[in-house]
């Protein structure tokens, strides 16, 4: 088959070269974006007098016909045409005749593919922000149900201090809020048009880049044609924001996996988000959480892969950039799927309040309350820390917890202890009294929920 770029060549590539060099098996994902870019380009060419009105109408009718076929999955792509751009150009020529070849006037595949990817990430970045917001609503709803549900807070995966479960959930709310901020910021660079930059140096035709950018909904255009066709920072920023988001989801997944284990029993996942074992009939595995934790690694790989591709490329376009798309598509699919699944998983999970509370009563996570108790009575905190540490050791030797220690032992450790020490040791009391800004006190958590709601309302 004769290549659309084949005029300079005396030989056609061998079949294996076509197979190796073709990108149509993955960049066909950009079919709608490519047609949208072509429709805008045709309108711009007409406005600038490069196409007649009749020519532009016929070209746009042909493109619209291809778009309808694409929506019905009726387009038959060929490796012989290499990529989405040449496939659609050939289809347009087949549809309306040689006039279809005029569409590529004042345009290169270099600015064409860059435009496609900007359009693709524009839509998906907006969608991801919407999915994050939906997940945040789920977290708020669940937090409202569990303001006074108490569980151990952990450091080093060791029980540290009792906290409100709502407080724990809100920690992820604010992580997701930062993720949204990162996507919003990256969107500024995504929302720029490279269309009209040509192969690298612009064009001799009197085009109007601002006009085509406006038709496509871009806020601005690239100021430098070399930069416009070779820039992939906007993809790297998207992949970076996605990597951080997936890291947050992976951390949450790890906790979900722990919490629904027999060792914790803090939650139970809905059957929809778990699977069984082919051998062990009793198993209920948190597969969705495990998959999200695992897929985080592949998103990291997509980012590192593109960074590695870009690090040695001279200006402007190089064929290496054909490899910029699969990781982008993969990350979009992974992030969108992970957010949808996680929101449903949290919304439908059952919280075992009794097991959470029981965990705070069978540990030493109230030891800090005891040290604070002494410090408030005038003892230097470092000395109080030492006194309570010795009491914890005494309890370990006796096989009891601080709340079960006889009052005489407290008095022996320090004369500052009074009978009210047992109130201080109650986990509910310990959580309730943590009223510093951003703390886990019930009133502060209730206020924090309102702040989170206001944050979403402002969005």
Curated annotation (Swiss-Prot):
The keyword Amino-acid biosynthesis applies. PROSITE patterns: FUMARATE_LYASES. CDD domains: Argininosuccinate_lyase (cd01359). Keywords: Amino-acid biosynthesis, Arginine biosynthesis, Cytoplasm, Lyase. Signal peptide: none annotated. It is an enzyme of class 4 (lyase). Pathway: Amino-acid biosynthesis; L-arginine biosynthesis; L-arginine from L-ornithine and carbamoyl phosphate: step 3/3. It is found in: Cytoplasm. Its EC number is 4.3.2.1. The keyword ATP-binding does not apply. Belongs to the lyase 1 family. Argininosuccinate lyase subfamily. This is Argininosuccinate lyase. It comes from Bacillus licheniformis (strain ATCC 14580 / DSM 13 / JCM 2505 / CCUG 7422 / NBRC 12200 / NCIMB 9375 / NCTC 10341 / NRRL NRS-1264 / Gibson 46). The lineage of its organism: Bacteria, Bacillati, Bacillota, Bacilli, Bacillales.
């Amino acid at each position: 088959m004769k290549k659309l770029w084949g005029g300079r060549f005396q030989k056609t590539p061998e079949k294996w070269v076509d197979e190796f060099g073709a990108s149509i098996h993955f960049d066909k994902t950009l079919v709608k974006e490519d047609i949208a870019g072509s429709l805008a380009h045709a309108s711009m060419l007409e406005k600038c007098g490069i196409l007649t009105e009749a020519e532009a109408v016929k070209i746009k009718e042909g493109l619209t016909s291809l778009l309808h076929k694409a929506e019905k999955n009726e387009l038959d792509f060929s490796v012989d045409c290499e990529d989405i751009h040449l496939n659609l150009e050939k289809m347009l020529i087949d549809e309306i005749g040689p006039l279809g070849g005029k569409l590529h006037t004042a345009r290169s595949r270099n600015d064409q593919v860059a435009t496609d990817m900007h359009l693709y990430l524009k839509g998906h970045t907006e969608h991801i922000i919407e999915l994050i917001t939906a997940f945040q609503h789920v977290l708020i709803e669940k937090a409202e149900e569990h303001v006074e549900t108490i569980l151990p807070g952990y450091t080093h995966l060791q029980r540290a201090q009792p906290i409100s479960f709502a407080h724990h959930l809100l920690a992820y709310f604010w992580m997701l809020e930062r993720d949204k901020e990162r996507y919003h910021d990256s969107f500024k660079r995504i929302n720029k048009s490279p269309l009209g930059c040509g192969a690298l140096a612009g064009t001799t035709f009197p085009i109007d880049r601002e006009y085509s950018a406006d038709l496509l909904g871009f806020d601005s255009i690239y100021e430098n044609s070399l930069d416009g066709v070779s820039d992939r920072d906007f993809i790297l920023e998207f992949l970076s924001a996605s990597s951080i988001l997936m890291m947050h989801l992976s951390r949450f997944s790890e906790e979900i996996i722990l919490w629904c284990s027999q060792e914790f029993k803090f939650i139970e996942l809905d059957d929809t988000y778990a699977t069984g074992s082919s051998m062990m009939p009793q198993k209920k595995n948190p597969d969705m959480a495990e998959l999200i934790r695992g897929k985080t690694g592949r998103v990291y790989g997509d980012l590192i892969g593109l960074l590695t591709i870009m690090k040695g490329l001279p200006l402007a376009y190089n064929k290496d950039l054909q490899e910029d798309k699969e990781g982008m598509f993969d990350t979009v699919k992974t992030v969108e799927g992970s957010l949808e699944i996680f929101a449903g998983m949290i919304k439908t999970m059952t919280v075992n309040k009794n097991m959470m509370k029981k965990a705070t009563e069978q540990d030493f996570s109230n030891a800090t309350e005891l040290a604070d108790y002494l410090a408030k009575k005038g003892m230097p905190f470092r000395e109080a820390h030492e006194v309570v540490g010795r009491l914890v050791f005494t309890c370990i030797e006796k096989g009891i917890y601080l709340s079960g220690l006889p009052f005489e032992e407290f008095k022996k450790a320090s004369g500052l202890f009074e009978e009210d020490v047992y109130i201080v040791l109650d986990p509910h009391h310990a959580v309730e009294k943590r009223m510093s800004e951003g703390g886990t006190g019930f009133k502060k958590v209730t206020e924090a929920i309102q702040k989170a709601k206001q944050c979403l309302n402002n969005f």
